């Protein structure tokens, strides 16, 4: 009986040891699999979202493409959203998860910082380009205009419609309104219902480019993007309207957001702006 008992104990012991070994192997395999998943996620490039003013819809994708190529990133690693600066700011205020905000003015980024002064924001606004204002028509020759003849054209009684971006939301619209006010024609045009207000500079250009209106105060970059003929636009002197200095701000701690911003401000990034009809920041 003693021998039988010992054999039974030995069998039970072997069975228990085998079960423990199998359990340990299973746990080890499970932990290894988890580690592989964690490492895979960690090695994936982070993705960022950029909220950009509508006037950047032509040049910014070019800059992103060049940056992605230089850094071997996929197209989807940087997501772009275009709208009026004011609309984007409202989205950010409401909690939209953007990593970088590129405004068409300096006001909104500065406002974002001032509203968080007590929390001491880690980043400060940076000026990334200066926009230019252009008087454009898809149907009428305006290339030979100058300051005097443009003022005369605007003041002359006419049924011609002129579009500007919403001055309250779009910096290009605010500068266009200021220009019209210095020429003493804004109130008259508004009263005559000849001013057609667009939501943003992108829509203003659409109105002018499709012939829905006769003229439009648009971004020089938009005119450059479509390769407009010299007869189709007149670039306003930069001293004739409030400077359109465009500021941005990094909103998150994402390393990719900081690195892309550095590229935006680099000579390579600034060359894209210059080629697109902006004034590069030196």
Walk through the language-model features, giving the residues of each.
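C-terminal motif of bacterial Sec signal peptides marking the signal peptidase cleavage site
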Residues: 22-26
């Amino acid at each position: 009986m003693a021998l039988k008992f010992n054999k039974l104990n030995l069998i039970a012991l072997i069975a228990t040891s085998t079960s423990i070994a199998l359990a340990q192997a299973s746990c080890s395999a499970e932990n290894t699999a988890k580690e592989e998943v964690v490492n895979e996620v960690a090695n994936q490039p982070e993705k960022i979202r950029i909220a950009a003013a509508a006037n950047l819809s032509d040049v910014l994708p070019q800059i992103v493409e060049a940056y992605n190529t230089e850094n071997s990133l996929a197209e989807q690693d940087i997501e772009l959203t275009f709208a009026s600066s004011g609309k984007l700011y409202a989205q950010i205020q409401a909690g939209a998860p953007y990593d970088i905000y590129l405004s068409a003015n300096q006001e909104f980024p500065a406002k974002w910082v001032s509203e968080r002064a007590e929390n001491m924001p880690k980043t400060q606004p940076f000026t990334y380009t200066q926009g230019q204002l252009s008087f454009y028509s898809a149907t009428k020759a305006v290339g030979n205009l100058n300051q005097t003849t443009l003022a005369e054209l605007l003041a002359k009684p006419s049924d011609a419609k002129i579009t500007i971006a919403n001055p309250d939301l779009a910096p290009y619209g605010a500068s266009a309104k200021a220009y019209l006010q210095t020429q003493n024609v804004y109130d008259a045009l508004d009263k005559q219902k000849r001013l057609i207000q667009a939501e943003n500079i992108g829509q203003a250009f659409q109105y002018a480019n499709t012939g829905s209106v006769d003229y439009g105060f648009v971004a020089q970059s938009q005119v450059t993007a479509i390769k407009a003929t010299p007869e189709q636009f007149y670039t306003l002197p930069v001293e004739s309207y409030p400077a359109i200095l465009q500021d941005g701000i990094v909103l998150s701690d994402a390393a990719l957001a900081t690195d892309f911003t550095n590229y935006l401000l680099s000579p390579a990034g600034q060359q894209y702006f210059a080629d697109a009809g902006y004034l590069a920041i030196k």
